[in-house]
Structure formats: structure tokens, C-alpha cells
């Protein structure tokens, strides 16, 4: 049986001018997932940049398999940086990082149940949330309400998205991870 995918969107799904500021409560959520999930049953999925919550995950989830979706035209420097982090790399068909949500939708949402933690981003992560909502298999979506674009998207998908609270998110997220 395949591992259960947990997508962490929070660093790669921005334009170059936006810097993800990590919040301690969401880093604590990631810590809890690392502590309570089984590395033999869960795989984490991130984007191509080594920033924000995705970087936090890479620094702390050493026992887990982590897949990084990268655009088809990734620079050699970024590719080497990802390889040094010991992640598995999936090359998306899209040439830019703003379009990799399409490959995540195809590779994950159309093939497996999953969990999406949308912690930061712009239109690309909003599109990822929409794709998760339209998934062939169940994708439980959790959104950071402090990110204005994500909060607006969550409000438009009322009933399909869970807004993360400032604390006590761990058990709510863990009950949807099939591992």
C-alpha cells in the first residue's frame, strides 16, 4: 500500500516578493505530525523552494520521505540544494513553480486520499486548495486564516475547508491522516 500524502504548502507557492513568516503554532503542528505519524506510512509533499514551513519540515522531518514537486525548468542551483536536503524529486510538466499545483493535483488528488495544510501562499496555493476540493479521492483541507488570500478562498468553499486555529489543531489534523 502506498504511503499517505500530507501536502505542506507554505513557502513555495508564493511569488518572489512574498516572504513566508512562520508562526510558532503551525511549526508546532508540523512537529506533532512528525512525532505522531509513522514514517513508514506517511509521505510529506512540498514545492521546490526551501523556504517557510516547507524548509521547517525539511529541517525537522529527517526520518520521513519527502517529495518536492519542481517545475520543468528548475535551475541547477535549486536542484542541487534540494538534492542536498535528501528529498525525492518529482518534475512537474509546468515550466514555472506557480503551476506545479497542477501536477500535485494529478499525481496526488486524482490518485490518493490526502491531507493539505495550506499555510501560506498566493494564487498558486489558492488554486491548489481548489484542486484539493475537486479531488477524485478525499482530501481534507486545512487553511491558515491569517493569510488573507487563503481565508477568502476558505470562505468561498465553506464546508470543504477547515480553518486552523491559533492552537489545538493537532488532533483535528491527525484524525484525517490514515497512518
Regions found by a protein language model. Name each.
Residues 166-179:
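A charged, well-structured terminal subsegment
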Residues 1-3, 179:
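N-terminal intrinsically disordered, low-complexity tails enriched in polar/charged
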Residues 2, 10-166:
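Acidic/glycine-enriched connector segments
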Amino acid at each position: 500500500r502506498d504511503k499517505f500524502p500530507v501536502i505542506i504548502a507554505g513557502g513555495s507557492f508564493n511569488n518572489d516578493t512574498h516572504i513566508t513568516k512562520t508562526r510558532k503554532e503551525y511549526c508546532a503542528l508540523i512537529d506533532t505530525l512528525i512525532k505522531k505519524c509513522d514514517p513508514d506510512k506517511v509521505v510529506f509533499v512540498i514545492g521546490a523552494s526551501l523556504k517557510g514551513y516547507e524548509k521547517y519540515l525539511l529541517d525537522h522531518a529527517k526520518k520521513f520521505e519527502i517529495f518536492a514537486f519542481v517545475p520543468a525548468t528548475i535551475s541547477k542551483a535549486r536542484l542541487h540544494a534540494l538534492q542536498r536536503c535528501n528529498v525525492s524529486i518529482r518534475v512537474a510538466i509546468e515550466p514555472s513553480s506557480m503551476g506545479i499545483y497542477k501536477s500535485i493535483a494529478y499525481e496526488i488528488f486524482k490518485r490518493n486520499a490526502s491531507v493539505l495544510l495550506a499555510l501560506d501562499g498566493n494564487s498558486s496555493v489558492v488554486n491548489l486548495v481548489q484542486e484539493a476540493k475537486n479531488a477524485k479521492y478525499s482530501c481534507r483541507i486545512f487553511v491558515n486564516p491569517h493569510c488573507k488570500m487563503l481565508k477568502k478562498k476558505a470562505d468561498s468553499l465553506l464546508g470543504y475547508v477547515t480553518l486552523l486555529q491559533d492552537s489545538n489543531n493537532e488532533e483535528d489534523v491527525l484524525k484525517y491522516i490514515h497512518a
